[in-house]
């Protein structure tokens, strides 16, 4: 069996180190930096010939820089005769550009990125909670899309929730919310119907379901500006919700996210470590982070040993 080696770019160094610790190994020796003009510079400083290589790199902000780091690292490892290269992308950027609505003159950038990664020599992709699962079909190589829900669920069960109800912040998240509700002792579910007048601006319309006197658990795949969740929480509290907890896998926290969350009525925001948090977000008392390092380490181990990934999520 080829030697398994982990490498990491500059996007998620803490998560990469946690994964390495879980696997009782160390990160590979690679210098990933910049030339004086800003171009990505990569130097692999150890033998990887024939190795089973995993590159841990989210394509979060700065998205283009982190994507280019990943691509250039793949090329460097491929030219160094790596046996198999798996791109471990905890957060897959550009995933929201996955279709042309009403044949609008826009790109399907998720497909462009998938082609880019395939063309430079990625043999396999491991990612977490793709914004749209069908993005897996954009790739010409195997994609393992694992879920953060078991980690989130474990935390929910420790919250001492009183008469909980799982809430989807929009119609598109119903499937995710239903799955969480089923695992959370088959609890009830509510849906927030909203309309989005323009990008990153959400207007809550009304709530489908009875939330009065209950602990509400909002679940989503990501938090961007936080506008959706904060307005959803306001609507829930107006309808008599007792407490509101917001759970999401990917903490993008762009734009006015810090102010939105600081001034919101959300009791606690719980996210995963697929994207590093800024100092401003870390300073917020109602934001807490869970690590996916154990789950990703197990997925990497299974891929390296040719074991089933889907078996991790069988209940």
Curated annotation (Swiss-Prot):
CDD domains: PRTases_typeI (cd06223). The keyword Ion transport does not apply. Involved in the biosynthesis of the central metabolite phospho-alpha-D-ribosyl-1-pyrophosphate (PRPP) via the transfer of pyrophosphoryl group from ATP to 1-hydroxyl of ribose-5-phosphate (Rib-5-P). Its cofactor is Mg(2+). GO terms for biological process: 5-phosphoribose 1-diphosphate biosynthetic process; purine nucleotide biosynthetic process; ribonucleoside monophosphate biosynthetic process. It comes from Yersinia pestis. Mg(2+) 1 binds at residue 131. The gene is prs. Belongs to the ribose-phosphate pyrophosphokinase family. Class I subfamily. GO terms for cellular component: cytoplasm; ribose phosphate diphosphokinase complex. D-ribose 5-phosphate binds at residues 196, 220, 224-228. ATP binds at residues 37-39, 96-97. It is found in: Cytoplasm. Homohexamer. It catalyses: D-ribose 5-phosphate + ATP = 5-phospho-alpha-D-ribose 1-diphosphate + AMP + H(+). This is Ribose-phosphate pyrophosphokinase. One of its GO terms (molecular function) is kinase activity. Transmembrane segments: none annotated. Mg(2+) 2 binds at residue 170. It is an enzyme of class 2 (transferase). Binds 2 Mg(2+) ions per subunit. Pathway: Metabolic intermediate biosynthesis; 5-phospho-alpha-D-ribose 1-diphosphate biosynthesis; 5-phospho-alpha-D-ribose 1-diphosphate from D-ribose 5-phosphate (route I): step 1/1. Its EC number is 2.7.6.1. The active site is at residue 194. Keywords: ATP-binding, Cytoplasm, Kinase, Magnesium, Metal-binding, Nucleotide biosynthesis, Nucleotide-binding, Transferase.
